[in-house]
Design a protein with these regions (language model features):
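Conserved S-adenosyl-L-methionine
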Residues: 178-280, 285-289, 294-302, 313-314, ...
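Conserved RecA-like ASCE P-loop NTPase motor core of nucleic-acid helicases/translocases
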Residues: 29, 33, 234-235, 329
Length: 434
């Protein structure tokens, strides 16, 4: 990721922000991110279409090639959504200056909803025809987002995710809230997924944000030649808007997941789920999680009810509760969870005594795009192999990073491989018992 790429999001935001004064922030974020989503969906579709045309050019007649290029099932089988003509970006752009462009965009969304009800129903609000923007405003945004160059393959999806993360943080700040960790850095999601050796089974993220862990898991399966249908995806997200973004993120990959909107603290949507893999990046040190609203004898908190002023061990116990007998968990956690005393210290002691922790990696600072708090990667397993019994592997990786800007560090591929080598016993632990 180059420095010039990082300034691109800022330029895009400043350009899009010019119209924000015309519309309420809670509506404008849907307008902007909905358009970017439509833009990317068409981009991915057109790239796949070009690939088909080039491949089939010498084998079939023009009419037959056209028929193949309009085969909906072919695109879905290849991890891309087929986009009907009147929902395509070219059609929207061609009509950008029409007085009814808002209706045209709403109709495009409805077409996609009808085509993919499980993935997209009610995900993008159809508000374009009723907001306080005229055709000139829409033309400005459409032309602006037409300039986004997504690149190729996984890089294209990285750019999409980065733009979404950046805009999510900006819109959250504009609403007077603290910017959240909606998009976990890919260098972290990829490392956790590799260490857990995610393959077939059930993967669960109860604080799924925009779905970054799911994407890294799906990409790992693709690299290893495993069909994505072998991995069942479950996620819960407390913020309605971010829940919608996660649904979009899976949709652009042609994946159906069971993603539900709700508060994991008090409304566990997957109470009976026992997952093979739990991956997560929960809110750090949440001081207003609602301890007084926890029901008596909640089975998740067998090690004790965490304090009101910090939810770190709410999440850790939530993960333990949802693990299958041979399940594995890998998650990002604020460093305070390693040293908190009083109730937290007692809970941590009991978890260690039950031999559930099998590894912790101390990460460098500034790994998150919008949050600078230091963090560690935790790895849990309910059933350790014999050689890991009574042991916890600690890896100090605080100096293992590449600075890509003043405010963000990343793990490079070399750093990831070094971490994987150092944590080989963790990978072995995940491979021995399957």
């Amino acid at each position: 990721m180059k420095e010039k790429d990082l300034t691109f999001e800022d330029k895009l935001w400043k350009a899009a922000d010019k119209l924000r004064k015309k519309v309420e922030v809670h509506e404008y974020k849907y307008i902007v991110l909905g358009l970017i989503f439509l833009r990317y969906l068409s981009f991915a579709f057109e790239e796949k279409r070009k690939e088909i045309e080039e491949r089939e050019a010498k084998q079939f007649s023009e009419s037959l090639r056209f028929s193949i290029c309009e085969d909906r099932d072919f695109y879905i089988a290849n991890g891309t959504l087929y986009v009907p003509e009147k929902a395509r970006w070219d059609y929207i752009k061609k009509n950008a200056n029409q007085p009814n462009i808002g209706e045209i965009i709403d109709q495009a969304i409805e077409i996609l909803e009808n085509e993919y009800p499980k993935q997209l129903k009610d995900v993008i609000p159809k508000i374009y025809s009723r907001v306080n923007l005229d055709s000139h405003d829409f033309a400005y945004l459409i032309n602006l987002f037409s300039q986004i160059h997504f690149g190729k393959d996984h890089h294209a999806k990285d750019i999409f995710g980065r733009i979404y993360e950046y805009f999510l943080g900006k819109f959250t700040e504009a609403e007077g809230k603290k910017g959240g960790e909606f998009y976990t850095p890919r260098s972290l999601t990829k490392l956790i997924v590799e260490i857990l050796d995610v393959k077939e089974g059930r993967i669960f993220d109860p604080a799924c944000g925009s779905g970054g862990f799911f994407i890294s898991a799906l990409e790992k399966l693709q690299r290893e030649g495993i069909e994505k249908e072998h991995l069942s995806i479950y996620g819960q997200e407390s913020k309605e808007f971010v829940w919608k973004v996660c649904k979009m993120n899976l949709a652009i990959r042609g994946v159906e997941g069971d993603i539900r909107w709700g508060d994991s603290y008090h409304d566990d949507k997957f109470f009976d789920l026992r997952a093979d893999y739990i991956v997560s990046n929960p809110p750090f040190n949440d001081s207003e999680w609602g301890r007084d609203r926890i029901k008596p004898n909640d089975p998740r908190f067998k090690y004790g009810l965490p304090p009101e002023n910090n939810a770190n061990y709410v999440w850790i116990q939530h993960y333990i509760y949802h693990l299958a007998p041979n399940g594995k968990a890998g998650f990002v956690m604020a460093n305070g969870a390693l040293s908190g005393g009083s109730i937290e210290g007692e809970i941590r002691k009991k978890i260690i005594e039950d031999d559930l922790v099998y590894g912790i990696i101390a990460t460098p600072p500034k790994m998150f795009y919008t949050v600078s708090l230091p963090a560690s990667l935790w790895f849990l397993r309910k059933s350790k192999p014999k050689y890991m019994k009574g042991k916890i592997l600690f890896i100090y990786a605080k100096k293992m990073f590449k600075a890509i800007s003043r405010r963000q560090n990343v793990f490079t591929e070399e750093h990831k491989q070094r971490s994987l080598k150092n944590s080989e016993c963790l990978k072995m632990a995940s491979q021995k018992k399957r």
